[in-house]
C-alpha cells in the first residue's frame, strides 16, 4: 500500500500487525461461515427429501464448526493482544493496563462493546457445538 496516498498505512518500527490481520481474517471467515450455516440449516429444515436434508445438515454442521473455530481464534488473538500489552491496538490501549493482574486482564474482554459482542459470540458457539453434537 502506498503511504503517500494513505498516511494511515504507515508502519512503525516494532509495530506488531500480525494479530490484527489474523483477527480480521478470522472475523471475515466467521461471518461467511455463519451465513452458510444459517442458509444450510434453513434448507435442511425445509427440504422434504431425506438425502438432500442430510446433505444440507452436514454442510450446516461443517460451516458452524468453521465459524466456531474462527470465533475461538478471534478470542485467542484478542487475549494475545491484551495479555502482551500491544497498545498499538485501540482495544488494548483503551481497556487494559500493564499493572493489571491476570484476572483483570481477562475481564478486559467484555469491558468494551466489541469484546462483549465477542464474548456473546463465544458462548453462542459453545452452546451451538453442544447442541449439534
Regions found by a protein language model. Give the residues of each.
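Polytopic transmembrane helical bundles with strong interfacial aromatic enrichment
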Residues: 2-133
Amino acid at each position: 500500500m502506498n503511504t503517500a496516498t494513505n498516511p494511515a498505512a504507515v508502519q512503525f518500527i516494532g509495530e506488531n500487525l500480525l494479530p490484527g490481520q489474523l483477527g480480521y481474517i478470522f472475523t471475515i471467515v466467521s461471518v461467511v461461515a455463519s451465513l452458510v450455516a444459517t442458509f444450510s440449516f434453513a434448507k435442511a429444515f425445509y427440504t422434504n427429501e431425506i438425502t438432500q436434508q442430510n446433505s444440507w445438515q452436514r454442510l450446516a454442521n461443517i460451516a458452524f464448526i468453521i465459524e466456531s473455530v474462527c470465533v475461538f481464534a478471534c478470542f485467542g488473538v484478542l487475549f494475545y493482544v491484551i495479555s502482551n500489552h500491544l497498545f498499538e491496538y485501540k482495544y488494548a490501549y483503551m481497556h487494559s493496563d500493564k499493572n493489571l493482574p491476570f484476572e483483570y486482564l481477562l475481564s478486559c474482554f467484555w469491558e468494551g462493546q466489541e469484546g462483549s459482542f465477542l464474548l456473546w459470540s463465544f458462548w453462542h458457539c459453545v452452546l451451538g457445538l453442544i447442541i449439534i453434537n
